[in-house]
Amino acid sequence: MSHDSVPSPITARAGTPLRGRLRPPGDKSISHRAMILGLLSLGETRVEGLLEGDDVLRTAAAARALGAGIDRDGPGRWRVRGVGIGGLSDPEGVLDFGNAGTGSRLMMGVVGGQPVTATFDGDASLRKRPMRRILDPLVQMGAQILSEQAGGRVPLTLRGPEEAIPITYATPVASAQVKSAVLLAGLNAPGTTTVIEAAATRDHTERMLRLFGAEVTVAAHGPAGHGRAIALTGQPTLRAAEVIVPADPSSAAFPIVAALIVPGSDVVIEGVMMNPLRTGLITTLIEMGADIARLNERDEGGETVADLRVRASRLAGVTVPPERAPAMIDEYPVLAVAAAFAEGTTRMQGLHELRVKESDRLAAVADGLRANGVAHAVEGDDLIVHGDGRPAPGGGTVATHLDHRIAMAFLVMGLAAGEPVTVDDGAMIATSYPAFLADLRGLGAAFAE
């Protein structure tokens, strides 16, 4: 999405039950990492099922600018010819990541650990997002910040060292992006780089580093073993790999909740990744009474995947503990929508990280609920939604603030609300789920553009 795109409003309205099957797009986290590790490996990495949304395509463009050879062989099928650790080239222009927070932050880890200089930029939303949490450990590892905006925001220029300094770093927030940036920088460090996190976050970087040949160990850490200590042996020779990208559970969240709240619905969502550090939403919905059956569990590309049969259900309010947040941080907007249709109160605790996503997601969700007549409150970093078991009133227009997940969440609300729901701009949905409207229309959803 360009910095000055014309808004594209979309309206969703209630209609017939949702029926049928769909496969959500490839996982965004794994797709980003496949491009980045393909760049840093020797040989030709082949990727099947890549998410071809704008975010991942920006990461692919950045990898190409840093020296990778990248070809698309067909839908979701890509080849990446890497340059190896230490083989990157200075890009000729700015690395424009659009809306891609994950891609920009992980690539800062790559640049910040290697002898290369690059300027990072993005759209209006990305320019508001904090990068200091990424830059601080990279500076400890030898990176130099040549220019930056207030608060360490993009556009910024980063220069990496000849060799990174191996460090032990305790992440100040539960963030897979911070952890991953440090580990990626540590690939060019002579020694062991260790990241300590107080709560386990999604572990795709660790899994994929091993797939490409790095030595990574993970040990329980801290009180009751809830945290993790991840140690990477630096300066390995990464070898090209075959990557099969499973369906993204964060994208699957939208048809899952739609099927639960639209009366009479019965939908099968195929090939969804069941990594336990990504299934917090499914766990929570089942606690609320959701009829979700896991079928045909199997292994794809080192991850457990399953087909999910989801049937319309009466939901009840629950309390979602803060320690579950890392396993569902991107799913709270659509969980809030489910809570609006539930009987009773749902309290989502410890949502401070939502304030620094593509938008201030906590405020954006609250505003969207208010616009559609849903009783709710924000208490500190907690979101409380009061439902009465009936459809949300709807009838409002939601400001998306260039946030794809806000847009999709409230379009899902509109499919079951008493009155249609409009989002002021749906263009950014393409960053993570380009076929969202088409997929849900295939199940019977009614959208007007």
UniProtKB/Swiss-Prot annotation:
InterPro entries: Enolpyruvate_Tfrase_dom, Enolpyruvate_Tfrase_sf, EPSP_synthase, EPSP_synthase_CS, RNA3'P_cycl/enolpyr_Trfase_a/b. One of its GO terms (molecular function) is 3-phosphoshikimate 1-carboxyvinyltransferase activity. Phosphoenolpyruvate binds at residues 28, 101, 129, 177, 361, 405. The active site is at residue 330. Its main location: cytoplasm. Keywords: Amino-acid biosynthesis, Aromatic amino acid biosynthesis, Cytoplasm, Transferase. This is 3-phosphoshikimate 1-carboxyvinyltransferase.
